[in-house]
Amino acid sequence: VTTEHPEVNVRVNNAGIQQRFNVLEADAVQNWSYFSNEITANMEAPIHLSMLFAPDFAKKENAVMMNVTSGLAFTPMAIAPIYSATKAALHSFSMSLRHQLSETSVQVIEVAPPAVNTDLGGAGLHTFGVPVDEFSDGIFKGLAEGKQEIGYGTSQKALRMSRDEIDEAVKNIYNRVR
């Protein structure tokens, strides 16, 4: 990319696999690759790409690295433990990357969606949440305001929750979806 398209100055990581399971019923011996794919897509790949692009982007006059995490990075959903954990790890990495690149022109932006009505996890599995258009408008508003961490609705609230509020939210989410 840096050789054939040197004008590229924005990288958006919007990868996501969300698998729901109970750890007591999961067969990690026979099916580890099933779980490993989620870790690779949600955490390993975006971190790797960020590290590959950072040196080139740091030389540019303006550049943006945007990582899409999730409101579940802050209030994990117990039946999607790997998804929640990988998005929390990507949040942590984004914060670290933002600090390391703070003396360059690179903006590191994190977008943390709430539940959005998409087909995340497969057709028909994720048909609840805010409409995509409404969510997108909220994200563009956050970008226009120059925010570095952008949530919407419940995820905006989760970005600033106290530890006690997080514990209560996690319990409520689990009781709703288990």
Describe these PLM feature segments:
Residues 50, 86:
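Active-site helix of classical SDR
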